[in-house]
Amino acid sequence: MPLSYQHFRKLLLLDDETEAGPLEEELPRLADEDLNRRVAEDLNLGNLNVSIPWTHKVGNFTGLYSSTVPIFNPEWQTPSFPKIHLHEDIINRCQQFVGPLTVNEKRRLKLIMPARFYPNSTKYLPLDKGIKPYYPDQVVNHYFQTRHYLHTLWKAGILYKRETTRSASFCGSPYSWEQELQHSQRHGDESFCSQPSGILSRSSVGPCIRSQFNKSRLGLQPHQGPLATSQPGRSGSIRPRALPSTRRCFGVEPSGSGHIDYSANSSSHCLHQSAVRKAAYSHLSTSKRQSSSGHAVEFHSFAPSSARSQSQGPVFSCWWLQFRNTQPCSQYCLSHLVNLLEDWGPCVEHGEHHIRIPRTPARVTGGVFLVDKNPHNTAESRLVVDFSQFSRGLTRVSWPKFAVPNLQSLTNLLSSNLSWLSLDVSAAFYHIPLHPAAMPHLLIGSSGLSRYVARLSSNSRIHNNQYGTLQNLHDSCSRQLYVSLMLLYKTYGWKLHLYSHPIILGFRKIPMGVGLSPFLLAQFTSAICSVVRRAFPHCLAFSYMDDVVLGAKSVQHRESLYTAVTNFLLSLGIHLNPNKTKRWGYSLNFMGYVIGSWGTLPQDHIIQKIKHCFRKLPVNRPIDWKVCQRIVGLLGFAAPFTQCGYPALMPLYACIQAKQAFTFSPTYKAFLNQQYLNLYPVARQRSGLCQVFADATPTGWGLAIGHQRMRGTFVAPLPIHTAELLAACFARSRSGAKLIGTDNSVVLSRKYTSFPWLLGCTANWILRGTSFVYVPSALNPADDPSRGRLGLYRPLLRLPYRPTTGRTSLYAVSPSVPSHLPVRVHFASPLHVAWRPP
């Protein structure tokens, strides 16, 4: 007969009113392997091989790798980004505010000024992969929304724009490590000429490009026409290496004359352009390289020289403007749209500052796409950047680890009678500047609308292997494209032209899609909070990533603190969003928990999620282990607040490890459901003197409670860890003390998942809220009783206990540097526990 839920509760000694025998007899029984096996069979916990098909969905939970279909919103608003500029002299400003900084604060702030990123190897992808075809039905809409988002980021100074292989431009205030290029005089339509100080080799190159190339090095004859340059990499004097992409239709932006002329006054340039804008875009920046045969040049115009237009008008190099002088091919021809505007604005925009960068190919290293900003805000979009190449494969980067506060540390730290508020740092990641040397590794961009459409539309034919150039301009015209562009024209106007050109952007601030970013953000905010705490010693400031909380004794005090801290953060260049400041009163909502003076509990929305999960949980049906991962993720978050804690979930963990389906028996489901119906707060640990000690040998146990000594023996010898755990349980139940001294590291760690299942569950309940102090065996007063000697008294130790806040130390204390001697217990082991000797 299967084990009923009532019997199971009695077995686990969870019912207070049951007439169980003395704990010293009952508990060792739960460690019995035979009993554990029988219960597992009864509850159907061990039966991992099932023949029935697996269930792949429970409520909202699907397998870990099944993708929920994302929904594209044509109405998405691109969020606005403030001009974020973290001041370079942040260390000096902090020192003016609080006096000299500690070594750790300095080290952390230097780490992000500027941040550096050196991956082992970088894989370059073609520009076509720049914008991911994430929404196949909304390709054009998604393309323009994403391009607009990228343009917004560039305008806000968050991205660099690659101008040439060795130069980039950006908007906003420059940092000292960004080496600006010297500009030549720009008057009228004179070309922009970069002459970087260190890039040019031995001989100096003349002040302007135009003068050098009066006789064309490329051998372009006037009658050959501009499109003869579709294979510029084949010419003799340019090394093939100098052009990273010969197939990418980046020709020379041509003019009608024979020499390569960078002025904007030749008639073949985009017609009908206003003279005002003419100077802004028509010139080209080029990077100069020395080749063995003299001066070689590399040209990159960002205009795809796609096709010679069919009509007899002048030839444009710009795909968009070529439509202007063509005969419409149908009522859905793009020429109708292009003729709507006289002035389509520049083909290319340049930033306010031009800097030199390491050699950057015309490629991307990650794709981008848009999603909802968050589940509660679907009106705004968020850019997702996929730099997962750096976390994969043999060359993956092992990201630095950093301390995340665990539940007990957090409670010890924040459970107090303070009044709280939390600050919202807007676009926190985009505060931290990246060194330009990282740019070649973090490239995003797009190949331009013509190629994007050509690649995705079925009717366009790329003929004769023409290096990706469209043979016929009108091949890309279609009703769908025309309708989409007409609608987008209402939103973006002349920018449609700008966004239809190819672009390559590199990150100037840390991106979210790289494992380095969370580490850097955590270092940054923890150092800032450390400074704030020292400036206001009677208050508490704490942060986890971009979540910053301030606590003060009274509401008035908190408000004045808020004003002072906000002004300080603004003076450093940190942007706060005042509309999102939340005042919590005396119970703080932080990291998914509610923390008050009584302790910590999970937030209400998590409790509701758990209830919903149990309502949907099927009984006697095998559930896919990937779905079990999701269920365990949710239940594991709230496990410390239940009677039996993590040990109760061990059968689920076991099935996930074995990659087998798990079947919930009615009793096990009822047991878990009951566990999560009553949640108990996790209280903060108090410091005190340890008066109660426990010790055990495989055959017996001993306790020292004050001046009293007790001992007992086990019916059969037990593993030493199990024996020590039983002794600790006896000490707690006999003395009621919340502070127990033990010499066993596993008991100290309070992780009872490696014990026999039934014992782990019960011990977790008995020892809930107990703090342990390490006492060396030689000094343990309970050592003699456990060996059966009651006569000899060792003096009682005065063992003070101080609760720890783990490695999330308040004053950013750096962890001690480990010696290079091998550690006896490996760090990944559950047995390892960080204790400081008394």
Curated annotation (Swiss-Prot):
Enzyme Commission number(s) from the entry: 2.7.7.7, 2.7.7.49, 3.1.26.4
UniProt superkingdom: Viruses
Entry's Gene Ontology BP terms: DNA replication; symbiont-mediated suppression of host innate immune response
Keyword terms, alphabetized: DNA replication, DNA-binding, DNA-directed DNA polymerase, Endonuclease, Host-virus interaction, Hydrolase, Inhibition of host innate immune response by virus, Inhibition of host RLR pathway by virus, Magnesium, Metal-binding, Multifunctional enzyme, Nuclease, Nucleotidyltransferase, RNA-directed DNA polymerase, Transferase, Viral immunoevasion
Note: Hepadnaviral virions contain probably just one P protein molecule per particle.
Domain notes: Terminal protein domain (TP) is hepadnavirus-specific. Spacer domain is highly variable and separates the TP and RT domains. Polymerase/reverse-transcriptase domain (RT) and ribonuclease H domain (RH) are similar to retrovirus reverse transcriptase/RNase H.
Name of the molecule in the record: Protein P
Gene: P
Pfam families attached to this UniProt entry: DNA_pol_viral_C, DNA_pol_viral_N, RVT_1
Residues reported to bind Mg(2+): 424, 546-547
Catalytic activity: DNA(n) + a 2'-deoxyribonucleoside 5'-triphosphate = DNA(n+1) + diphosphate; Endonucleolytic cleavage to 5'-phosphomonoester
Chain segments carrying region Terminal protein domain (TP): 1-179
Notes on activation and inhibition: Activated by host HSP70 and HSP40 in vitro to be able to bind the epsilon loop of the pgRNA. Because deletion of the RNase H region renders the protein partly chaperone-independent, the chaperones may be needed indirectly to relieve occlusion of the RNA-binding site by this domain. Inhibited by several reverse-transcriptase inhibitors: Lamivudine, Adefovir and Entecavir.
Source lineage: Viruses, Riboviria, Pararnavirae, Artverviricota, Revtraviricetes
Assigned protein family: Belongs to the hepadnaviridae P protein family.
Any GO molecular function: metal ion binding
Site (Priming of reverse-transcription by covalently linking the first nucleotide of the (-)DNA): 65
Record organism: Hepatitis B virus genotype A1 subtype adw2 (isolate South Africa/84/2001) (HBV-A)
Family annotation (InterPro entries): DNA/RNA_pol_sf, DNApol_viral_C, DNApol_viral_N, HBV_DPOL, Rev_trsase/Diguanyl_cyclase, RT_dom, Viral_Replic_Matur_Polypro
Record region (Disordered): 218-242
Domain Reverse transcriptase residue range list: 352-595
Summary of the function given for this chain in its UniProt record: Multifunctional enzyme that converts the viral RNA genome into dsDNA in viral cytoplasmic capsids. This enzyme displays a DNA polymerase activity that can copy either DNA or RNA templates, and a ribonuclease H (RNase H) activity that cleaves the RNA strand of RNA-DNA heteroduplexes in a partially processive 3'- to 5'-endonucleasic mode. Neo-synthesized pregenomic RNA (pgRNA) are encapsidated together with the P protein, and reverse-transcribed inside the nucleocapsid.
Location of the region described as Polymerase/reverse transcriptase domain (RT) in the Swiss-Prot/TrEMBL record: 342-685
Region spans: Spacer: 180-341
Residues in coiled coil: none
